[in-house]
Regions:
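Extended beta-strand/loop cores of jelly-roll/beta-sandwich
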Residues: 1-73, 122-233
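An exposed tryptophan-centered "aromatic clamp" motif
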Residues: 70-106, 191-193
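Alpha-helix capping/hinge segments and adjacent helical runs
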Residues: 93-128, 134-136, 140
Length: 233
């Protein structure tokens, strides 16, 4: 098979979502990746059987999500109606990811990062571990020693205490307080003193359900210009 290889210059891209609502959110955190090396990427997705033969016989790799995104943002690659599998594999977040262009394979991963093409436009998609795609996107890296442990890296996990405080505050402001206000004007006398626990749990429930549609944007991360460490934007 004659593969068209496209050269990609070093650059920066943002990966991930800052929206953590259940319905509209994506995998987070949103973070910058700095790719310092040149590489070549296949212009089109390659049939998986052909791609596997090429990987075995040539110095090629499955493209990482970061490499794919940098090429896509520079309008260097294309597709038609394929679902292509990238080399990143996640459990549910990007925490602990090295942000230098290498593939991110999370411990105990359960989903494969993919791109779905429809009418020439790609969208982010995730498929379960046991499923496979019919296409891969390949890259050829000019330098085999691009990655090391001193590269910028996201923290191992989110600030759980901050997330918990945010959830409690949302439940208080949008669930519990409105429940008591409603009861004050509409419920029978004595209901608040006798049924306050129901109002609290009802407010908490409303707060939790609101996560389906909305949550405040999460912090994004960038690569520091001088220190080479990940910093909150």
């Amino acid at each position: 098979m004659n593969i068209e290889w496209i050269s990609v210059s070093p650059g920066k891209v943002f990966i991930g979502s800052d929206n953590r609502s259940i319905l509209f959110g994506g995998v987070g955190p949103r973070h910058e990746v700095k790719i310092d090396y040149d590489y070549e990427i296949s212009y089109l997705p390659i049939d998986i059987e052909v791609a596997q033969e090429i990987i075995q016989s040539e110095d090629c790799f499955i493209a990482s999500e970061s490499e794919w995104t940098l090429a896509m943002e520079n309008k260097l690659i294309s597709g038609e109606n394929e679902v292509e599998e990238l080399s990143d594999k996640i459990r549910g977040s990007y925490w602990s990811k090295y942000c230098d262009g290498r593939p991110f394979i999370e411990e105990n991963w359960i989903m494969k990062v993919c791109r779905t093409w429809k009418s020439g436009k790609p969208s982010i998609s995730l498929i379960p571990r046991h499923e496979s795609c019919n296409y891969l996107r390949l890259v050829r890296r000019n330098n085999k020693d691009n990655f090391n442990s001193s590269a910028p890296k996201l923290p191992d996990s989110s600030n759980k205490s901050r997330v918990l405080f945010e959830e409690l505050l949302i439940s208080l402001l949008f669930g519990i307080i409105p429940s008591f206000i409603w009861a004050h004007f509409n419920a029978s006398p004595g209901y608040i003193s006798e049924g306050w626990l129901n109002l609290v749990f009802g407010g908490l429930f409303i707060g939790v359900i609101s996560a389906t549609f909305w949550r405040p944007k999460t912090k994004s991360w960038r690569v520091g210009e001088n220190c080479g460490k990940m910093k909150i934007i």
